[in-house]
Design a protein with these regions (language model features):
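Structural recognition of the beta-strand scaffold that forms the well-ordered cores
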Residues: 49-52, 79-81, 96-98, 136-141, ...
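Metal-dependent active-site segment of extracytoplasmic phospho-/sulfohydrolases and closely related
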Residues: 49-50, 68, 229-267, 303
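Short, structured active-site-proximal loop/turn typified by the sulfatase FGly-forming signature C/S-X-P-X-R
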Residues: 59-94, 101
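His/Asp/Glu-rich, glycine-adjacent segments
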Residues: 101-216
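Polar, surface-exposed loop/tail segments
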Residues: 294, 309-338
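Substrate-binding rim/cap in mid-to-C-terminal beta-strand-loop elements of soluble/periplasmic
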Residues: 94-98, 267-310
Length: 338
């Protein structure tokens, strides 16, 4: 009896031990499965920079002329054939970029500032950012024609430094941005509309296009201008790094005109220009070639998508969804990101 009892006890002990082992392994497998199914946590984007160039294309990067932009391309998503608009001029193209509308809808076909025409009636991405999430925008422009788009609102700040002022240069516009950020972080605002760091910064950098049109697209002067534009992009990104914002910032780069095309004169051919469109930074797939058709009109909706915002307004801008690492996650309601 004693032997039988001990054998029974041993068998029962082994059975219990086996069940516990199975349960523990099941828990490990479940935990591993759960870990595999949960995507890598990606910090939300709180700031977006949009660099708007002129006279820029894929060939502009050859010879190491633009190392900062080359790095953004390598670390981000790109298409070199985003469609622009007709007429292929600075003001109509910029109007389409910020309204997310084709020229036939926003109606701006001219290329100089005409006070009598007033501001465009169409809402802009700046309006949608405010309405959808209370996000502010700061816009730095380098051509007086773009005054046409500078409709004053409590959630936008515009600064202009165009060719009519001889002292204006790419370096000068960067210094304005640095001053703006210094005032924003001083605790005193800047005497303008926004009293905090802007959530959306637009930087217009047309120097390369102007130099290419006047001195030749194969000239040394054009390559030097590309280098200055690249240096400006690097300097603006340095400002964000100094403010500790790099890990919360996404950058976009596009151009109002391709290399070889003057944004002041419409080309003789009827083709719609193709321009670069680049996204890089927080939440963007690295080293990714965009497959879907992209239009510069899509920039506004993609910026909003990046910030976790949506608009149900009918406009022609569509988010370029394939560039993102994770599915859309709405920004917290009522958040005040700085």
């Amino acid at each position: 009896m004693s032997v039988s009892h001990n054998c029974g006890w041993s068998i029962w002990t082994l059975a219990v031990s086996f069940i516990l082992w199975v349960l523990s392994q099941s828990g490990v497998a479940t935990a591993a499965s759960a870990t595999a199914e949960v995507p890598v946590s990606i910090a939300p984007t709180e700031h977006v920079i949009l660099f708007v160039l002129e006279g820029f294309g894929q060939n502009s990067l050859k010879g190491g002329t633009m190392p900062t932009l080359s790095r953004l391309v390598k670390e981000g998503a790109v298409t070199w054939s985003a469609t622009a608009v007709k007429p292929a001029l600075r003001l109509p193209t910029m109007a389409s970029l910020i309204t997310g509308m084709p020229v036939e809808k926003h109606g701006i076909t001219w290329n100089t500032f005409e006070f009598s025409r007033g501001y465009p009636r169409a809402p802009s991405v700046f309006d949608y950012l405010d309405l959808s999430g209370g996000r502010d925008s700061a816009i730095f422009l380098m051509d007086e024609s773009l005054y046409q788009l500078a409709r004053p609102e409590p959630y936008t700040d515009y600064q202009m430094c165009g060719p009519l002022k001889p002292e204006c240069s790419t370096d000068r516009i960067v210094s304005y941005i640095r001053q703006y950020f210094n005032k924003a972080t001083s605790g005193h605002g800047y005497g303008h509309a926004i009293l905090s760091l802007p959530h959306f910064l637009v930087v217009h950098l047309p120097e390369a296009g102007r130099v290419g049109a006047s001195r030749g697209w194969t000239s040394k002067e054009y390559r030097d201008a590309l280098r200055r534009v690249d240096k400006a992009i690097h300097s603006v990104m340095d400002i964000y790094q100094e403010q500790g914002l790099t890990k919360r910032t996404t950058q976009f780069v596009t151009s109002l005109s391709p290399e070889g095309s003057d944004a002041n004169q419409e080309p003789a051919d009827a083709a719609v220009p193709m321009v670069p469109w680049i996204a890089s930074g927080v939440g963007i797939k690295p080293g990714y070639a965009i497959h879907q058709p992209v239009s510069i009109l899509d920039t506004g909706a993609t910026v909003m998508r990046t910030l976790g915002l949506q608009t149900h307004t009918e406009w022609d801008s569509r988010a370029v969804e394939e560039i993102f690492q994770a599915a859309f996650a709405a920004a917290p309601q009522g958040s005040s990101l700085q």
